[in-house]
Amino acid sequence: MGQLLSTEATTSIPSLRNAFFVGDILTKRDCLRLQSLASNVRIINMYGTTETQRAVSYFPIPPVSEDPVFLNGQKDIIPAGRGMKDVQLLVVNRTDKNIVCGIGELGELFVRAAGLAEGYLRLPDLTEQKFLMNWMNHSLPNQSILENGNSTAQWKAYYFGPRDRLYRTGDLGRYLPNGDGII
């Protein structure tokens, strides 16, 4: 998508059906430009970091051929959307992380998802600062399965036990009234 937008492309691309955007802020201007070249394209805005190892949210923009006025209702910055399946985007108060921000309130973004990186190689202090146990969940599963099972099972050396971790992204975000997030 970036290459199409950065060049002076003028040729229509009616066969383009999907364009995925991740890694930067997506603007309404860029979406309108792409849709002017490809009226059948569905643009999917996504958010993800190296530490989450994948995109963790999505916001679909329908093709202009299906909904010609959809972008008229959007602000200049396209939302990051909602967490994908089994992903939670938490926006918390910057001074008290025990308070989840209300709609429209700016806060720090945390990601709760399976597949978070274990941490940063040879940077234990940064790992401790950015990868946190979920302080909001007090009901982790019972450890007795590990304690009562076969103590020589080889897999136990690689199993970290039941965990509920959050990644502190360092990004600021807020919730929209419909539940989508803006980063």
Summary of predicted features, one role per range:
Residues 27-28, 36-45, 57-183:
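AMP-dependent adenylate-forming
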Residues 1-9, 18-42, 55, 86:
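Short gly/Ser/Thr-rich phosphate-binding loop of adenylate-forming enzymes
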